[in-house]
Regions:
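Ligand-site clamp/hinge motif
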Residues: 125, 253-256, 283-329
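Periplasmic binding protein-like
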Residues: 38, 111, 311, 322, ...
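N-terminal lobe/hinge region of extracytoplasmic solute-binding protein
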Residues: 39-93, 101
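Surface-exposed binding/hinge segments that line
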Residues: 138-242
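Extracytoplasmic/peripheral linker and loop segments enriched in polar/acidic and small residues
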Residues: 378, 382, 390, 424-429, ...
Length: 612
């Protein structure tokens, strides 16, 4: 699932670390031969979740286990500093200057130090300040300017357009190479969840210049010099490898450097569409001491199949997309020691419309007439049976579930009611077929309006959502076409669909977490949406510390989103985590990504352990 609001960069940063109070770090607590198996609903496909392609929960969950970081969120959620890994401190408020220092002895699993080179790479890649070209696509969603991308600097980060881009000065390295100091051009309210270490600098540079046979030290030095000198010719191949070089669906047997880790676990096996295996990093001493030696994450998209695997003992933990049938199935196997936790999580279901693919919602289809395109978008959104989806698919699981009427704040959160009261979502509170027909007539649209609708084929709940939407929209004259795809996540932003349903998942409590999605240059802007008023409001929000003023800016943003018929939100996900208490303990679900993975160091295998 594309998350991520696993929003701009945080998949690789604030969610990728660990801590345990009162326990000595290192390998002392690893139980030899211990192993557990977890089911996840999407296959791992990239070891760099900071890229626009890799920015998915399925990847970020894995890299959370393999990455150290300066902080993480617990189950409250509360941001916790991990000072065994390193520290960060505010040196100045004007200009805002933050110093990040990695502790001595923190290393990658190949023995190279984690240091300023890694932090400089994280800055240049996720700030996108040196990017001098961007991807362009043809009608089929294929990149049409590959030669320009290859020749230029293009860090394809999900964080492009984010607040890290306000650090335009090259960060200064200090403390013998273990620290960098970031100086922001303006105050940034969410600075504490804005930066961290991603993929290894030496590995990235070694691959970018494979013919030079660079040592780790030489590779780091080459990268640092290129960044400090703004040597775009050197940075071009580095950006290319950073953007796609860590993508993988099978274990890179011929090149294990691609799975080098600086966290508690190391990827030791990966089989396409089947599983990924993680083995405890026995040299890891800069974080909490994990107990489980081997964790296998199996890829099971079908929720009922995941329940069956849990019941059969093939996996020990699952977190399937919830339906009434899933809850019933889990209750039926409770006698086997299956514990089920249900709660609302930080993911919300939404439908987005594409503005830039020459489809029915793009002004280009009407000779550039933006008003006509907006009327067609409004008409389509009026046919979305949001209440039917809620009552038929969600309330059987959670009777208290309500419609989500905000694009930026989850139901129940501070400010939600105030925003919803004025944002214009009431226009789409109920299905309005007559209103939709009237809008299409005013737009001068005749005949059926074809809408290519993207969703994941294997997701039962979304199959049901699509069926309800298709039937309702047909009454107003829309031909909603099933364009489901098992690899739907990789198609986001390609322009090959007109509408899409999926979930955004929050990784932090940042007030600007939605900026990457709705800002014109946002790394998660997947549909070509552009609105100057929205961009200006986000620019102000980034530096606004007054909560009342923050709320007014969010109101402005949402009013524009609904006035432009950007799309609609539907519901907050009902979260389900189930595990076998006879095989594992210590499972504590959390609302933010990475959800139940957040405290993996507290997991303990129960029952017999067979030592190899």
């Amino acid at each position: 699932m594309k998350i991520k609001r696993i929003f701009a960069g945080l998949a690789a940063f604030t969610v990728s670390v660990l801590v345990m109070t009162g326990c000595a770090p290192g390998s002392a607590d690893i139980v030899a031969g211990s192993s557990i198996s977890v089911a996840w609903n999407q296959a791992f496909y990239s070891n760099n979740p900071a890229t626009s392609n890799g920015n998915a929960t399925a990847n970020a969950n894995i890299t959370y286990l393999t990455s150290g970081a300066f902080n993480y969120y617990d189950a409250v959620p509360k941001l916790i500093k991990e000072e065994r890994f390193g520290k960060y401190e505010v040196l100045s408020q004007d200009p805002l200057s933050i110093k990040y220092t990695v502790n001595e002895g923190v290393k990658w699993s190949d023995g190279a130090a984690v240091d300023g080179a890694d932090m400089l790479l994280a800055w240049v890649a996720n700030s996108c300040v040196y990017n001098n070209v961007s991807a362009e696509y043809d009608a089929d969603g294929n990149i049409s300017n590959q030669a320009a991308l290859d020749a230029g600097v293009f860090f394809d980060s999900a964080s492009c357009g984010g607040d890290l881009g306000k650090v335009t000065q090259v960060p200064v390295i200090g403390d013998g190479g273990r620290s960098v100091t970031l100086v922001y051009d303006q105050p940034i309210v969410d600075w504490e969840v804005n930066f961290g270490i991603g993929v290894p600098a030496h590995v990235t540079t070694q691959h970018a210049f494979a013919g030079e046979n660079l040592s780790a030290a030489d590779a780091k030095a080459k990268l640092i010099k290129a960044i400090q000198d703004k040597d775009l010719a050197t940075l071009a191949p580095i950006s290319k490898f950073w953007s796609a070089g860590f993508d993988m669906v099978d274990f890179p047997t011929d090149d294990p450097s691609l799975v080098v880790s600086n966290g508690a676990y190391v990827i030791t096996d990966l089989v396409k569409d089947q599983y990924v295996t993680l083995t405890a990093n026995k040299n890891y001493t800069w974080g909490p001491s994990t107990k489980i030696e081997t964790i296998t994450i199996r890829f099971i998209e079908d929720p009922l199949a995941a329940v069956q695997a849990l019941s059969n003992g093939e996996v020990d933990i699952i977190s399937p997309q919830a339906t009434a049938d899933i809850i019933t199935a889990l209750n039926d196997v409770a006698s086997k020691g299956i514990v089920t936790n249900t709660t609302s999580d930080s993911t919300y279901e939404h439908i987005d419309l594409t503005f830039n693919n020459k489809g029915p919602f793009d002004p280009a289809s009407y000779g550039g007439d933006a008003d006509k395109a907006k009327m067609v978008r409004q008409a389509f959104l009026k046919t979305i049976p949001r209440k039917d989806i809620l009552t038929k698919l969600i309330q059987p699981i959670n009777p208290a579930a309500q419609l989500d009427d905000s694009q930026t704040i989850l139901p129940g959160a501070a400010g939600y009611a105030e925003v919803v009261a004025v944002n214009g979502s009431a226009e789409y509170a109920n299905v309005d077929i007559a209103g939709a027909k009237d809008l299409l007539a005013k737009a001068g649209v005749k005949g059926k309006v074809a809408v290519k609708f993207l969703f994941g084929c294997g997701n039962t709940r979304r199959q049901n959502e699509f069926a309800l939407i298709q039937a309702s929209a047909a009454e107003a004259g829309f031909d909603v076409q099933n364009k489901c795809n098992d690899d739907w996540g990789s198609l986001l932003g390609s322009g090959t669909y007109d509408a899409v349903v999926f979930g955004w998942q929050s990784t932090s409590l940042a007030v600007t977490s939605s900026k990457a999605t709705f800002a014109s240059d946002g790394g998660n802007n997947l549909n070509g949406y552009k609105n100057t008023a929205v961009d200006e409001a986000y620019a102000a929000l980034s530096s606004e510390f007054d909560t009342a003023k923050q709320l007014e800016l969010l109101k402005t943003i949402e009013k524009n989103l609904f006035a432009d018929a950007y799309g609609v939100t539907i519901f907050q996900f009902p979260g389900v985590t189930a595990y076998n208490k006879n095989k594992i303990s210590g499972i504590v679900p959390a609302p933010l990504a990475p959800m139940f993975f957040w405290n993996f160091w507290e997991w303990k295998q129960e029952g017999e352990i067979i030592k190899g």
